[in-house]
Each structure stands twice: as structure tokens, then as C-alpha cells.
């Protein structure tokens, strides 16, 4: 027992002794009042620089102490280490004086540069030269005053040839981007003086006209332009130059007018010959980033910013030519992919995958970084063959096996190196990472641990039980880690941990001052054993920073390892067979310290050395040669001819002999007993098999190269139920997201225009989706109590809980706010226990996170305040039941944030409609049993919308609000409701929606209520409608005819048919009048998709339709049916195809596509020359039945989607995305400063009657691609900037339409009162309205709201008259009633002022100068020398001048009165009566008598002195009445003038004396009545 006690005592003493002798590194700490902005090491040095509070400090002892640099006297905004010279660094200021050191910070000198002024917009950037470090460029952006960094800013470059020893010189070119050819160590391009620059030429509009690439060997004293084919200087925009390894990449934006355009990359190895890479990447929403590359391959990521919540990237790698790229990995979460240092081909990446169990808790740090709450999980994978294969990361833990769906997932696996970059560490395969084991990365940071790998990331072990930031020293033999907790509230680190055995064991060391770690670093090459830990203290009251210097130099007594302490480490060993994998034809070996060896490598500033071991050549060491590509069908390394490449290589050649494979550039494999022929075969190719036949046809150059058309096929389970394009921004070209719902209740999303689709990972049954008016807004409706909300076009969805299930009694589930994405109204159903259900409205202002009940028993609600021009933004209208026992609907208004009860606006309504900035309410007048229309423009005041007198709308009659885009409301009122024979009247309102007139009768509609009415996009006032020609029959089959209006519904004509069909044959009815032979088109009511319109808003003047030529419209299946095209707004037409075709416009009309809509097909037809010629293109190997053809709603894209029935399974659908993006070799040149030399021309719509270009009172000019310029695309060119309003035209009959209660007589084109109504009826109707005090005498015409005509013929003279008994209000309104204070101000105030002035003048100027007696002695013709008034000051001088002027004036007046007495008094009376007897709203003209008294000789012949316009005029007393002469530009209107009063032609000239005054009075008429 005693012996046992002794043993325990010995053991305890030994343990205590071991604790007291445990190694602790040397630690020192420096306290600072604020944290450092930047901290960096000089390479191969113990010296580092720190930027803190605009002061630059230096430490020469690995951070143990710091001192300010005395040579620097100015505030420093940033500093930069020179990668070409490890002794040099630069410190930049906000002045012309900058600082440079060339001895690692010991001494600093200044250099001056004209770089900074008030317009500089960015931090200056230095461009380095690896061959001659003294050659440097420095640049900054200079922007127009008050503007941020944008396209209008100029990039200013300065250069030095002596390392800034002399003042830098400005480059002589205004470059956009400049790069040295020797921007990398391995570049073989050019020489040390070679500089590449891009230069953009702008016009006065700020548009890029040309983009050039130049090089120079003398800093642009001379320059040479580099021509890149097919990149023309006028096409696209060069946005960047990259030098990566020995590759030079020129990155260009395909559409220079769109910053989110597709990009192209042109690659060169000599800087002279460039070839376009097949990098067909849509980076419309993202950024291209180049990753560490090699001489054998370029690597890059494309960050996809399509999702604002969860950003992913795609990872691409090229072949050794840099021309052919392969997507190696998709959905890289946050772009988090990292190459393992020192090991070729090794990468670790985090991948975003759809989560089946979305996290609904509070956001953690990871949630903010990676969007953890957005139904995405993160899975980590590793590749050891340059991304060709990826596998889950193996954890050496028996409880976590990959086959059990468990692996290691890493949040971070990088350290901050001495240069300030994040790297995996300069070690021989030793890595550290923070993460967790399981199916995916944890969403909470505190669940993560720290793991270590010793085989380059293939397998891992747990190192620490908490997450940590870390750094490596002595090639990984010293590891320092500081705990870092990612909770919202977390404790500061009180310890740090270190390992001296490559992460196998760890020791803990206390920190004197706990910190939140900000940085931990060591020397750049990771060979030092000294570390720096920087962080802020845990006090919330201050931001003190502590910098710890930790020194492990004395560990193991500083022993240096011997040969026996090293082992051979072979990289890239496979998990399967433990054999090393060959990459680039070699294996990699490292000589590293054994894990348990107690010594250090101790080779300070010596990088890790790689031992290369060549491998036997295999198929993997070869790649496809020029003209070939990897086969998509074969899994092996099989290369097949590439039609795209060969079409370029075969130019002017008939045959090619090419090797199908080549050895990868830089590959080090050993051929051994193999021969080159064992891997490569020489192929002979006939160019005729690969070159488009039409491509070389000089007679038909208009169809592009069909080899550039790409087809992408996607298969879906279930039939198509719903699809919609979703815009991502206000940019008209950004609607590339497509949402598809199938009949099996699944939803698929594409964010690349239909090239690929991803299924939304929602297990709930999806009933449908709604797309809001705000870009990106999509909401999925499910059969559960959940909805899924997206604001990024469906890239991510947030799960929200709804208060109730959607109501089947409401025709929609959601009403959106027009401007605020977080607001919408939910319509749900709430049922009681007795089964009685009500439809309720619920409102949210936080995108569905919470809901509040808005109103019960609703039929629908809308945010009307957001659409009305002058309405309250929070105003909401709801139509709801008056009571549960009453089925009548009432209209209620309420405020979103108000607690007040809803206000009842109308007691009994049918419904309401929002039309542009109007709200139209259909109310029921119970007394008259009729339907009334009420209109509001502010949501508060409603006005009666009066229908024509002869149209009584019954409560059961349907009316449809069609359009309001032309400052008037178009409405269709059904007048015949007999099934299958429905039609009605097309009504049009005045500008405020209160008076409706008949625009067209017998307009066709269908049973559902849709109307054959199409407003043509892009053309003012052009409308196409179908009418029922046999309306009187009232039964049977409708005979439809198509009419077109070019003046907003005022006049209608039939469509003029083409003379011959598409086969050059005449039509049977050719030669007959239009009423027997016209073009008729199938309209809105017959479309499968109502979004398929005749026209396109971007393809101005283009219309396509299906129809026939004849007397009436024939059925679709009739043999006469064909497809027709118009390019001049419907004036002329041509037949383009026999049969029924679906059509779409692309690229603003430069691409037209047709697909057979009836028969199965495997081809489409396209035209690139505005429909002049058409080409057939086979898009599938078998025939399919096309259901729809679609593109973005703006018709500006070059991608089209065909929705088709799956040929193998008719229950499923397929999409064929036809991509014409590359069919044009260039972008059309737009130069508004020199329009004669670009690719556009002006086009004006021409009125079919008269042939003039005046439409709505003005001549407009629109830009279109010029005829014959069919080799270019438009893209986002701002053609609207070139729009010209050439002139305002004189008014003609075409600028007027019939006034309220007037109707157009088609026989003579005049407006007549509706049947059964007289002028007296009009007075009665208008005066019977509530609060009415005036009515108007109408001429029968009113100006079309769109018209801007001036002068010319005036048809619309409005004359206000008082309603009976309302004369007083009328006079007050027009300012004729003077009383009260008005009378005081108008009479007494001026009288008082006048009397005071007279008294003052009398006292100072008359009385003291002798009174009136003295003034009477003044003679007009005598000098005033005898009159010397008193003038003591300046006031006396002024007064005396007034007196003298008054004397002269009185004298003249007396003489004038005496003369006028001789004129006949009767004539004066008549003149006075006419002059002063003016009516409001009437023109001011003069009535002249025809007789004179005997004293007329006093003035000679009176008539001789009149204006020539009044010569020989004959007037009488009745001339005072206003008469409106109608002189039409069309002969038919003469009839109307004959039916009215006979007016003397000479009166017509007098009628136009004072047009401006009449316009002012008409404005007065439109003012509201006084209350």
C-alpha cells in the first residue's frame, strides 16, 4: 500500500513537472486606440506596414512594436506592395504628392502626379510590369462634376520609366483600360515596353460609337491598332484586358448599350492574333473573375447575381488554347471555390443545393453570408483532376461515412497571408478548415468545428471543437488558431491555440486582453515561426485594438530538422485505390517534416519546393484539336468535327486536313513506348459539309450563318399549365427569367432565357403562381397554408404562412401594389361551422411575414392610389357585399394604414376596372333600371361617364374597358348578347373619361367577353378591330370584316390587300373594290394566348397576322388562310406563308420567326431582313406539335422558346429554346451625330388617305435599322434618343372626332347628332346633372386628345352658356359678377390712389408754381423758357415733368374730341356695341357698317384704310352670332356645310382673328364650377 502511494506521488510530481516545463511562445502586445484598416508584410521580410487613421506605421520586428513613418507628412488613403520588387511599396494621398519606398520602408521619398482633383471618382490603381519593374502606370477616373463613377467618366493614365524618380507623364490617349504585356511572370507577349489600351469614342449623346484596341512600344508616342475579327471597332465594347499566365484575353460586351449584356472573350498568346473563345456565357447579372490559372488552362467563375438572396457562381475551365471552355461546376455558393496551393488540379468548392427542409429560424452569420433561410443548403466537394470530377469530402470518422450520406462541409478553408489575400496556405498539403460533418453545412456558426487535412484536402480529421481563424508557419509545422464564435452575441477570445505537430495535438495559451479577432497572419511564404494576432477588445464602449506578436522561434530549442526527420508526400492520392493521380502529365512530390518530429524546417523565406515526376502519356493528356470538339454522345475522350469552328476555318477553302487531337500545352507526360499516332488521327474534311450553303451566296447575304443558331431542349413531366417571363429590373432587356407550371403541379424556373430550367424544390402541391408588376416579383400558391414569395425572379423563395386558404369566390388570390414589392392583398376564404363561407381580404406590408384583416365579404380589392395620377398612395378600393343577406355589391374605399371603417362610395355596383390612370365603376341606377358609369382620376371625386343618348345600358349588359393609353378610355358595350352572335359598340371617351362617343359599331366579341380590339404598340392611335358585317341577321354565322383606324378610332378603313400571294399568284377577288376584296385578320378572340398580339412595341411599324383576302374573314382551317406581314403600320401588307403560323419578333424586329401552329413540324422559318426573304431551319430531328412560340414581352431578345408536346409521351411537354444571339456578326452602329454613316434610317408612318406623314397633328420620325443593313443586330441601342418630332402640322378633319352625342356619317365623313336627339336635348341633358351651371353649344366635333396640330381648320369651337336660373353662378365663374371686397379693390382703392396722386401733384407742381392760371399761359408751339417752376430736389423735377406732360395731353384730347364730333354717332354706337358685346368663348371680330354720313371725307374713303381681308365685306346684325364654317380636306364634308347656315366665304378669314384668346377661354371652361 505504501509502495502504491509512492508510485502515485512520483507520477503526480512528474505530471506537475511536465506542466511547468510545457512550451509557451514568446508574446508581446501593443495597444492602439483604433483598429488597423490594412496590415501587410513585405515579401521575404519581418517588416510590415499598418494603415490606421490615415497614418502609415511600420514594424521591423514582426509586430512587436510600431512607429510612425517620419518621412510621410500627409494623410494616407491606402498603400500597396509592389509584386515585382519585394523592397518597394507605395503610399497614396489625396493630393498630387505620393510616397514610395525602395528599401522596405526605411526611407520614403515623394513623387508628384496630376492625379487628384475634385472630379476624381476612384482610388488610383498602379499597373505593374514584371519584366521591367521601373515601368509603371498609375490611373484614376475623372468624372463630370457631381457624377459618380459611370460611363461618362474618363480613365486617366500616367506612366513612368524610372520608377517615379521623375514626374510621371500622361498617356497621349484617353484610354478605358491599359495593361502591360508583361503583367505576369510567365507572359511571353510583347516586350517590356509593350502596352495594350482600349479607347472608346463617344458621341455627344454619351453613346459609344467605336471601341478600339491599340498597342504601343513607346507609351503611345506611336500606336498600332489591333484588328480582332469578327469584333469590329463599331460593334460591341471592349470592357477589359486580362493577362493571365501567358494568355491575353480581351473581354468585350456584345451589346455596347447594355451594361448587363452578354460578353465575348477573345484569346491570344502573342497579343496580335485573337480568336473568339466559345465562352457563351450569359453574365447579364454577374461578374467574371479569373482564378489561379496555368499555362495549360484558364479558370474563371461567373458570379450569378440573379438572386439577391443567394448568389452562386459557375466554374469554367479551358483547354490549353484558352478558346474552348467547359463548365466544371455549377451553383458554387457565393463563388466560394479555392485552388489548393502548390498542388496542381486540386480544388475545394462549396455548392448550393436545394433544401428539402428549409430553415425557418432566426438568421445566423451564415444565413447572412449565404442566404441560409432561402431554401438552400451548402455542400462541400473536392476535385483533384482540375474539376472534371467532384466528390464529397471524406472525414476520418467512423460515425460519418460518405456511403451513409455523411461528409465534411467547410465554411472556410483559407488563411489571410502576408499580402492580405485569402489562401489555403503555402504548405506541402497541410490544410485547416472550419465546418461540420453531416448532410450539409450547418446554418448556425456555433455548431461548427475546426478540421485539419494532411493530404491536400482529400481526407480530414477533427482538430478543435470550435471554429477558429488560423495561420501556418514553418511550412505548416506551426499552426496558430484563435477561437471565433459566430453567434449574434458571442464572447471574445480569451485564448489562442497552437500545434507543433501539423494539427495532431493542440496547446492553449491565455490572452492578456480578450479580443474579437480581426486578423492573424505571418510572412507571405509561410516559412516564419512568428505570427501576428490583431483584434478589438471586448468593451462595447471603445474600439481599442490589441496586436499580439507570437514567436515560436525557441520551440524545440530552435532545432533544425535532419534528413531522418523528413518524409516524402505524394499529392492527389485517390480515395479509391490510394494511387497518385497524374495531372498535366506529371505527379507531384513534396519533402516535408514528419508529423511527430520535434524540429523545424528552419528555411526562412524559402518557398515549398515541388518535385515533379513525369507520367506515361494517356488519352487524358490530349485534347481536341482546332476544328473539333468533345462528343456529347460518347463518354470517352472522343473528338468530333465542330461545325461552328469549321465554318470559320473553311472560309475560301474546299477541304481541310486537321489532327483531331493535340497534346495539351505544357503537358509533361512521357510517351514511353507509345507513338503520337496512337492518340492522334489526321482527318480530311470537306468544307461543303460544314459551311452554310446560303452563307457564301452573294445574291442572298441576308440570312446570316445558321451554324450560329443554337437549340437547347428541355423535358418536363406533365402538360403545360402556365408560363410567364419575369423581368429582373426596369431594363427592358432583363426579362430573361421564365417560370413554368405544369399540370402535375410543379414549377420550373429558368434564368437564362430558357436555355436550362431548374425545378423549384417545393414538395407542396402548387396551384399556380402570380407575377407582380414590380420586376422579380413572383408568388407561388400552394394547396396548404403556405405561399412562397420571391423578389428575384424565382431564383430564391421565402416560405410564408397565409391566414386562410385562397377563396374560390374571388377570381384571383393576390392583388399587388404597383410600386412597393413588400405590399400585397391576399384573398382568402373563412368558413363557419355551419358551412357558410365568406371571402375576406388580408393585407401585408412585409412581403407576407404578417397579415392583417382588411375587409370581409369582398369580391376584389386593389391599390388604386398607386395608379391614379393624383391619388393617395394608400388608397384601396374594395367591392364587397352590402350584407350577408344581400347579394348586391357596393364599392368601398379605405386607407391602408388607417383604422377608420371603410367608406361606402356606391351602394349598388356591378364592378370596377382600372384603366391606366382612370378607375371606372359600373353602377346600377335602380330607378331607371340602367347601368351607369362613373370615372375618377384622383380616387375621391367621381364624374358621370355619359354614354351616347341612343345607347341605354341595361344592368345585365356587359361592358369591357379595353384601353386608355391614348389619353382616352376605350370601352366595349355589348348590344347583342345572343350566344355565338355577340357584338357591341366600341365607345371612346374624352380626355377625362366623362363623355363617351361611338367610335365603331357592331364590334365583335366572344362568349367570354373578349373583344376583337387591338391597339398597335409603338404607333400612336393605330387600332385594328373586327366588326360583324351581318349584324342585322342577329343569328347564324357571323360574317367578320377587319377594319383599321390610323387616328385613334375617329375614322376606319378596310385593310388594303396585297396584289399577289406568297407564291406570286393573284387573289380571286383582285380588282374588286375594298368592300368586296380586302384583307381580314383573325383577332383577339381567337388567340390561344392573348399575349400574342399583331404588333411589337419595339418593332415599330411591324404587324403580323393570320387571315385571308376576300369579302369576309374565313375560318382558320379554310384553304385561303395565310400569314401576312406589314412593315408600315398596316398601310400595306404582303403574304409571307400559306397556312396558320405562330409568330414572334426578336431584336426589335430584325429577327422574325414563324412556326406552324396547326400541323406537326420539325422546322421553323426566320427572316433577318424585315420579312423580305425567309429561311427554313430544322430545330429537331423529329416532328413535334408546337403549342406556343414565345420570347420576352418587349421583343428585344434573340432567344425564342417553342412549347411543344413531347413526341414520346403526349402527357409531357418539351421546350425548344432557339438562340439567335450569335447569328449576327456585329452590332448595328448608331451615331446620332453622323446619322448618314451609321446603320439606321428614319421612318415615318404615312396616313393611307392623302399619303402625308402628319399623324395626330405632327410628323414623327422613328429610327429603324436601315434597309439592306441585315448583318447586324440592334440590341439595346437607345433608338428613342433619335426620335424626332419633325413638325406640328396644321389641323385637318383627321385631327377631330365626333363630339358627345354625335356620330360619324360614313357616307360623307361628317358628324351628326345621334338619332332622336336635338340641340335642345343636349342642353336639357347637361343642365340636369347635379351642380351643373353651364352647358356647351357643340359644333359636333372635338379634337382627338393625341393631336398636337396648330392652326389650320378649326372644328371644335365650344361656347359655354348658362343653364336656366344659373346665370349668377355662371357670371361669377367667368368673373362678370363684381361685389363685396372685389368691388372695393376694383373701384375704391384705385380711386383713393388716384386722388392722393392728384393732390400731391397739385400741391407740389401746380399750386406753388402759380396755379392753373399760370399753366393756362403755356403755349404748345412756344419754347418753355418763360415757365420756370420751382425745383428744390429730384421729386420736384419728376412732378413738374408730369405737369407739363399733362398739359400737352389735355391739349391733344381737346383737339381729338373736336374732330370726332364730325363722325356719325350711329356708326360709333354700332362700333361700340360690337366691340363691347362679347360672349365668353367667342372670337373677337369686327362688324363694319356699309354707309357713312356726309363728313366721311374728314378721313377720306373709310374702306381704303381697312385690312385687305375686310375689303368689300358685307355684314349685318346677325353676324354677331358665332358660326363655324367647316372646310374639310375631304370633299365629302362639303355636304355638312350646306345643311347648316350659309356663311359668306369671306367670314372664314375673320373667324380666325384671335385663336389664342379662344384657347385660353376654353381652358377656363374646363375649370370646376364654384361651390
UniProtKB/Swiss-Prot annotation:
Residues 1527-1571 are annotated as: Disordered. The keyword Transferase does not apply. The chain crosses the membrane at residues 1383-1403. Residues 1404-1571 are cytoplasmic. GO terms for biological process: Golgi to endosome transport; Golgi to vacuole transport; protein targeting to vacuole. CDD domains: Sialidase_non-viral. Its main location: Golgi. InterPro entries: Sortilin_C, Sortilin_N, VPS10, VPS10-sortilin, WD40/YVTN_repeat-like_dom_sf. It holds the Pfam family Sortilin_C. Residues 23-1382 are lumenal. Keywords: Glycoprotein, Golgi apparatus, Membrane, Protein transport, Receptor, Repeat, Signal, Transmembrane, Transmembrane helix, Transport. GO terms for cellular component: cytosol; Golgi apparatus; membrane. It is found in: Golgi apparatus, trans-Golgi network membrane; Prevacuolar compartment membrane. Belongs to the VPS10-related sortilin family. This is Vacuolar protein sorting/targeting protein 10. It comes from Candida dubliniensis (strain CD36 / ATCC MYA-646 / CBS 7987 / NCPF 3949 / NRRL Y-17841) (Yeast).
